[in-house]
Amino acid sequence: MSDVLPAFWAVIPAAGVGARMAADRPKQYLQLGGRTILEHSLGCFLDHPGLKGLVVSLAVDDPYWPALACAHDSRIQRVEGGAERSGSVLNALLHLHAQGAADDDWVLVHDAARPNLSRDDLDKLLGELMDDPVGGLLAVPARDTLKRVDKHGRVLETVDRSLIWQAYTPQMFRLGALHRALADSLVADVAITDEASAMEWAGQAPRLIEGRSDNLKVTRPEDLEWLRQRWSNRR
């Protein structure tokens, strides 16, 4: 891994509502350690010297963003989010193109509700992929025994976990290649769950970079409680 890391753009799709949290606001605006989850997710990028700029995709009627201190940071640009994650990311990429970003610029897409990204993992991703022809993503090898089930919840088989990884973020790809993959997949009405799946559909093979397992995405209330306890123990 090189000591000289590449410059990059960051994209944070933050237009979702996080219904599984059953909270009074989108999960990215819930509190964690005195700040919102979204502020923590943005912070690792804003503190990085390689950041060229950051685009956050937000719901049109988002009432929470303007109250955040980072909403006035000149390095952050806001765009309208889409109905799905892929649309939100595509809107951000179109905005970067309009601002003069080049097709071969690196773009890192990170979940708005993944607040515990470490600087070491970010630097590892940048260093390992800076010369990669495709790009890739942080990921973690599956640890638990995995079962494939039928529609009734009955086990069909045990899956070989040595071949299974959990996809995390950031996911790092060239701006032009990711833009084409997302745009074409939307036209083809292909189900895209993350940026890597769009690149896979386009015929590419993203590289997995092993990261920390505590870079978890807040999806359920117990995820947030786990992070709160962990952060409290750091004090």
UniProtKB/Swiss-Prot annotation:
Pathway: Isoprenoid biosynthesis; isopentenyl diphosphate biosynthesis via DXP pathway; isopentenyl diphosphate from 1-deoxy-D-xylulose 5-phosphate: step 2/6. The keyword Metal-binding does not apply. Keywords: Isoprene biosynthesis, Nucleotidyltransferase, Transferase. The record marks R20, K27 as: Transition state stabilizer. The keyword Nucleotidyltransferase applies. PANTHER family: 2-C-METHYL-D-ERYTHRITOL 4-PHOSPHATE CYTIDYLYLTRANSFERASE, CHLOROPLASTIC. Catalyzes the formation of 4-diphosphocytidyl-2-C-methyl-D-erythritol from CTP and 2-C-methyl-D-erythritol 4-phosphate (MEP). This is 2-C-methyl-D-erythritol 4-phosphate cytidylyltransferase. It comes from Pseudomonas fluorescens (strain ATCC BAA-477 / NRRL B-23932 / Pf-5). The gene is ispD.
